[in-house]
Amino acid sequence: ARSQPVNLAMRNALCDLSEFADYADVIKRFMNGAEVPYKYQNGVYALPDTQQFYMLFYRKDIFEELGIAVPKTWDEFLNAAAVINRSNMYVGVPYVSDSTQNTAGIGAVSLFPTVLLQSGGTVYSEDETKTMLSSPVSIRSFEFFTSLYTDYKFPVTYNFFNRFRSGEMPMAIAPYVQYTTLNVAAPEISGKWGIAAIPGVKNGDGSVNNCETGGGTGSVILKNSKHKSEAWEFLKWWTSAETQVKYSNNLESLLGAVERQATANTEALRRLSWSRDDTNTLIEQWKQVIEIPEVPGGYYAVRAVDQAFWSVYNNGKEAGDSLTSWSEIVDAEIKRKRTEYGLD
């Protein structure tokens, strides 16, 4: 899981992979920054295995019927949502509300960190000793994020596949791997839908910042292993483009395209069975992924944002006050963990 390598590394249980002589060459297999969640102090404790990110899914047929253009900014997204809602249809913005959020990492739980990064903010301070959740940009981003559900009434829980297939939800942000599910299990809408970059914030020069946070898994080597060199050779083999392509193709041949690997290897993704246009769209959005570091006590940040959200959504608490109060709890836990492991 996303958070486990750092949790184990700070307990001195993992091997620092950056100490291997050819690490610098191996890490080039992945998108720039993919290793960030697996860094601790001056070491790197996992190789990216899978990496997931969001894309905008839209129904071409319904967009044409309603006269909607594919939105590039959040303002355009909300304008399109208004047209869709007036037609008694829904818009989907993902929120992970089950137990998997505890190990998924803050970047994969909701779009709040994405909105925060697009607005120029960060989750943690530069030295990673505290959060920046009480900063003005964090509060503005959280207010916007929560307003999607409180003011615009986007559903918090929904079945993306069923609603998108039926046309009940013609626009939604979803993990890019939903692409294969729709291709295989919804042949009746083949050619009637597409993918695009997620909405972003317009910069002063007119360009759009549509960066986003990501999720995924990593592969590790235990520090007490008596076969570190052999384990490293295995990780290099496992994360290579050849192995990832073969593994994914074998899964697809046995279980169908829905099992296509969400590989972190960039060359492997290009060699999998995506259409040329969609491959280019995926790669361009993948380049915009900015991973959030995992820090000691960072699991409280995931919980804090979740609790702050529900206090706004369920209890009507003011978004800024809710996030600020929870950020103090996170900072206290980070400080406690840093003291416990001799970092302060």
Residue spans for each PLM region:
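Short amphipathic alpha-helical coupling segments at ligand-binding clamshell hinges
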Residues: 137-144, 217, 226-238, 246, ...
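Extracytoplasmic/periplasmic solute-binding protein
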Residues: 40-49, 54, 78-130, 169
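Hinge/lid segment of periplasmic solute-binding proteins
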Residues: 1-54, 78, 107-111, 190-199, ...
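Periplasmic-binding protein-like
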Residues: 143, 192-220, 235-260, 336
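Glycine-centered hinge/linker elements that transmit conformational signals in sensory
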Residues: 80-85, 126-156, 198
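C-terminal capping/gating helix-and-loop segments adjacent to ligand/active sites or protein-protein/ligand interfaces
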Residues: 48, 213, 274-329
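A bilobed periplasmic-binding-protein/Venus flytrap-type ligand-binding module shared by bacterial periplasmic
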Residues: 57-60, 214-227, 312
